[in-house]
Structures are given as structure tokens and as C-alpha cells.
Design a protein with these regions (language model features):
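Low-complexity, intrinsically disordered or signal/transmembrane-proximal segments
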Residues: 2-4
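Short, Lys/Arg-enriched N-terminal segments with co-localized hydrophobic residues
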Residues: 6-19
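Short terminal alpha-helical segments
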Residues: 21-87
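Charged, low-complexity interaction regions
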Residues: 46-53, 105-108, 123-135
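Amphipathic, non-membrane alpha-helical rod segments
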Residues: 51-62, 111-127
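Low-complexity, small/polar and acidic-rich linker and loop segments
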Residues: 90-93
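Short, charge/polar-rich alpha-helical segments
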Residues: 96-111
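Amphipathic alpha-helical binding modules
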Residues: 116-159
């Protein structure tokens, strides 16, 4: 296994995945890449889930669990979130969900809080098929991306 550790111990690369600690925050470029998904995920007529499979009765009498086939844009978005240092490996799922539900908190969230909320959005699919679609359809991802868009403009203003 190839492991590369940055000099400041703020990030580590294992098998090609960049893992950042909580103090390592996304760059302006990282934010721009993510906010570019806002019009794509919320375009008129967009559906995050293309179809559901499974759920049928098997020969042994048991049932297979249903699972979604996601729109490729959804898969691309969550792949980017998972690979670009947006994950908080010390997050508390319940706390992250409470943060996501608090629209006022999301409107003023820090980058660290956004990482925590996005981690909940990404990781939830592992435990509940269709979670990604729910996060998009119920507007959680929209609100987080809108907050990131504000942070993007604040950072651009600070750098000009």
C-alpha cells in the first residue's frame, strides 16, 4: 500500500484517495468545482434516481432489497465530494443530520460544518439505499451548495 503524508500532517494519500483532517479546509477551486453542480442537480425536470431495481421475491421465498440507479450527475457529485477532501472522518451522524435540518444554521455554516454535513450526505447511502436521492430531493444538498456559493463569492471578494 502506498501512503504519502504531507509535511504538515494535514493530509494523507492512501491508494490514491486524499484524506484530510478536520483542520484542512477545501480551497476556492474545490468550492467552485462543487458549486458547479447546483444548476445541474436542480435543473428543471432533473431526477436524481433514474430507476429502482430489486425488491422482488427470490426462489427461496425471501425478497431482495430495492436499490436505486442514480443519474450519472449524482454519482459524479458524490464521487467528487468523497475524493476531494470534503469528508469529516470524525463526524457524528446524528449531529450532522440535526445541522442539515436547521436551515438557519446551514445559511451561516462554516466550511468545517459543511464538511460534516456533506459527510452525512455521502455516508448515508451506505446504510440506506436512496439516501443520496433523498438528500437532493428534499433540498439539503441545494442549501449546502447555496451556502458554499456564498462562501465562494466572499473568498473571491477577499482575494481581489
Amino acid at each position: 500500500m502506498q501512503v504519502q503524508v504531507s509535511p504538515a500532517w494535514k493530509s494523507i494519500r492512501i491508494r490514491g484517495l486524499l484524506i484530510m483532517n478536520k483542520s484542512q479546509l477545501p480551497t476556492l477551486q474545490d468550492i467552485e468545482e462543487l458549486t458547479a453542480f447546483l444548476p445541474r442537480l436542480y435543473a428543471e425536470g432533473f431526477s436524481p434516481i433514474e430507476s429502482w431495481s430489486g425488491g422482488e421475491k427470490l426462489k427461496d421465498g425471501s425478497f431482495s432489497l430495492p436499490y436505486p440507479t442514480y443519474n450519472p450527475v449524482v454519482e459524479e457529485f458524490f464521487r467528487l465530494v468523497s475524493s476531494k477532501g470534503w469528508l469529516d472522518y470524525e463526524y457524528d451522524p446524528e449531529q450532522a443530520y440535526q445541522m442539515l435540518k436547521d436551515e438557519d444554521l446551514v445559511k451561516t455554516a462554516s466550511l468545517s460544518q459543511i464538511k460534516t454535513m456533506l459527510t452525512f450526505c455521502v455516508r448515508g447511502e451506505r446504510f440506506s439505499d436512496g439516501h443520496w436521492g433523498q438528500m437532493i430531493e428534499e433540498g439539503y444538498i441545494r442549501r449546502v451548495l447555496e451556502r458554499l456559493d456564498e462562501i465562494k463569492w466572499e473568498r473571491r471578494k477577499d482575494h481581489s
